[in-house]
């Protein structure tokens, strides 16, 4: 500005942010009109750098440990002030946004970023309300300063970067990291703490609605198919990653999608493919010499992403909400090749598998994870984002399933016929056929076969799916080896579940070790 004070852009529009980002060298335009930005060495979340301020109003409700690490209040205040001082002479971008598409349960947020592209990401992923904060709630402050370098000895951080949540002061501080996914996941963690106190279940899931108004939820870790399977050309999308389930309905916590791009194809994922256009942020995607994105190129990371607003999707629920779900799908990526492609779960089995969260890290979103695929147990299908003890969420899930009568299914999007490296992965058309049968209600009350070792009930037929695939033992050439792997998997479930204090009815609902 003329007087030398740096400019602050308030509620800037996408075109303006893209122009500024290009002029400042923050990114480049692709042939399809999207803005490509690179995040440097951190191409995923940094769980070791995430903290929660330990203070009286929330400390007794938080499950402290390796996921939720405590940070001292005084150290937080000093660091927040230091970052504010650092931003004092910078051109800044500020937006008033909301998290939670529900009049009773939204949180108003003010997002301040050092870069134009991070502001574009925030405006794509959070909700841009017609009227900001209509219920006049206290506003959360988010500061994102990727250019600030933390000094662990001075700041009390783990490295040169940090993410810190402060529930008492309603503040989120992101310093020293460019990976934009940290912004959305930090506000997800905030809602995951706040919503259960109101009897609302926060969920790491995607959601869509059929033409008859029937809602389906898809739970799963990154890379298991949440975004791909919910982006269904025959159904209306509510959202692809974060939702709340309140008595009476399901609402999106966000206003956009953050889709994985690795090996993205127009044939298999037309909805996502068509959403990538002007206004979209492509994160760590490599382009060829003609500026055409090469989604097969994982030179920068397996975790390349597209961040776009829900408006980029033609078939969507404009109000970001839906009725309570008739069907709930737990997506698991089984690297051992043991689990069936679909199982029908009882209420107790649903609680067991929700707490277990068995799956694989596929193209993991975490820093430093190798491209090697390994199995993992991630509580509630999203352990890194849930501040309260796991039982709180499992209890809420059972309550909601029971009161509405939702049917829960376990769907394996991983391997069959042998473990990873030997067997083959279920292809997307097979999984889509299973999901089609689930959402149409064709698997309700069907004849099932009980797989004793896994303690799972498997339908004997699914329209559009080869019958031989339904019982996994049929796909293994070596039946004895299958039995061995099934035993190992059952044992690992049992060992993992020992930490949970739950009723026997849930404890005995898992595989038989």
UniProtKB/Swiss-Prot annotation:
Catalytic activity field: oxaloacetate + ATP = phosphoenolpyruvate + ADP + CO2
Chain sites annotated for binding Mn(2+): 185, 204, 241
Molecular function (Gene Ontology), one example: ATP binding
Keywords: ATP-binding, Cytoplasm, Decarboxylase, Gluconeogenesis, Lyase, Manganese, Metal-binding, Nucleotide-binding
EC class: lyase
Xref: InterPro entries: PEP_carboxykinase_ATP, PEP_carboxykinase_C, PEP_carboxykinase_N, PEPCK_ATP_CS
Main subcellular location: cytoplasm
E.C. number(s) listed in UniProt: 4.1.1.49
Coiled-coil intervals: none
Residues reported to bind ATP: 185, 204, 220-228, 269, 305, 431
Known partners and oligomeric status: Monomer.
NCBIfam families: pckA, PRK09344.1-2, PRK09344.1-3, PRK09344.1-5
Family statement drawn from the similarity comment of this UniProt entry: Belongs to the phosphoenolpyruvate carboxykinase (ATP) family.
PANTHER family: PHOSPHOENOLPYRUVATE CARBOXYKINASE (ATP), PHOSPHOENOLPYRUVATE CARBOXYKINASE ATP
Entries under HAMAP family matching the protein: PEPCK_ATP
Protein known as: Phosphoenolpyruvate carboxykinase (ATP)
Species for this entry: Shewanella woodyi (strain ATCC 51908 / MS32)
Gene: pckA
């Amino acid at each position: 500005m003329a007087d030398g004070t740096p400019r602050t852009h308030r509620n800037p529009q996408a075109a303006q942010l893209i122009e500024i980002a290009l002029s400042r060298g923050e990114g480049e335009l692709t042939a399809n009109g999207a803005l490509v930005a690179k995040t440097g060495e951190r191409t995923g979340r940094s769980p070791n750098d995430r903290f929660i301020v330990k203070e009286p109003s929330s400390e007794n409700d938080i499950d402290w440990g390796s996921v939720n690490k405590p940070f001292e209040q005084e150290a937080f205040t000093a660091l927040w002030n230091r970052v504010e001082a650092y931003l004092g002479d910078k051109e800044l971008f500020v937006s008033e946004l909301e998290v939670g598409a529900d009049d009773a349960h939204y949180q108003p947020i003010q997002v301040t970023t050092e870069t134009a592209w991070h502001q574009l990401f925030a405006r794509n992923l959070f909700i841009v309300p017609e009227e900001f904060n209509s219920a006049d709630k206290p506003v959360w402050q988010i500061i994102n300063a990727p250019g600030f370098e933390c000094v662990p000895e001075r700041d009390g951080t783990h490295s040169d970067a940090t993410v810190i949540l402060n529930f008492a002061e309603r503040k989120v501080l992101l310093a020293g990291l460019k990976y934009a996914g940290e912004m959305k996941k930090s506000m997800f963690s905030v809602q995951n703490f706040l919503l259960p106190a109101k009897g609302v279940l926060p969920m790491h899931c995607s959601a869509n609605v059929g033409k008859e108004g029937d809602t389906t939820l898809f739970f799963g870790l990154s890379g298991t198919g949440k975004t791909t399977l919910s982006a269904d050309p025959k159904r209306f999308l509510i959202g692809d990653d974060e939702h709340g389930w309140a008595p009476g309905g399901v609402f999106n916590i966000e206003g956009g999608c953050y889709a994985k791009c690795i090996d993205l194809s127009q044939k298999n994922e037309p909805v996502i493919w068509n959403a990538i256009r002007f206004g979209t942020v492509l994160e760590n995607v490599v382009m060829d010499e003609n500026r055409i994105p090469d989604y097969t190129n994982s030179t920068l990371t397996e975790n390349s992403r597209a961040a776009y607003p829900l408006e980029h999707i033609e078939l969507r629920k404009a109000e970001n909400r839906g009725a309570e779900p008739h069907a709930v799908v737990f997506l698991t990526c089984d690297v051992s090749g043991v689990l069936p492609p679909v199982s029908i779960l009882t209420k107790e089995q649903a609680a067991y598998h929700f707490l277990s969260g068995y799956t694989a890290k596929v193209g993991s979103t975490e820093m430093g994870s190798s491209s090697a695929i390994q199995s993992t147990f991630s509580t509630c299908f999203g352990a890194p984002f849930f501040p309260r003890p796991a039982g709180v969420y499992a209890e809420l899930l059972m309550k909601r399933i029971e009161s509405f009568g939702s049917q829960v299914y376990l769907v394996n999007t991983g391997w069959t016929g042998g473990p990873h490296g030997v067997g083959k992965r279920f292809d997307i058309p097979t999984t889509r056929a299973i999901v089609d049968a689930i959402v149409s209600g064709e698997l309700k009350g069907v004849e099932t076969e009980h797989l004793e070792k896994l303690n799972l009930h498997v339908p004997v037929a699914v329209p559009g799916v080869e019958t031989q695939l339904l019982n996994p033992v049929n796909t293994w050439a070596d039946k004895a080896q299958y039995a061995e792997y099934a035993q190992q998997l059952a044992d690992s479930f049992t060992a993992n579940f020992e930490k949970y204090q739950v009723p026997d009815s849930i404890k005995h609902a898992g595989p038989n070790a």
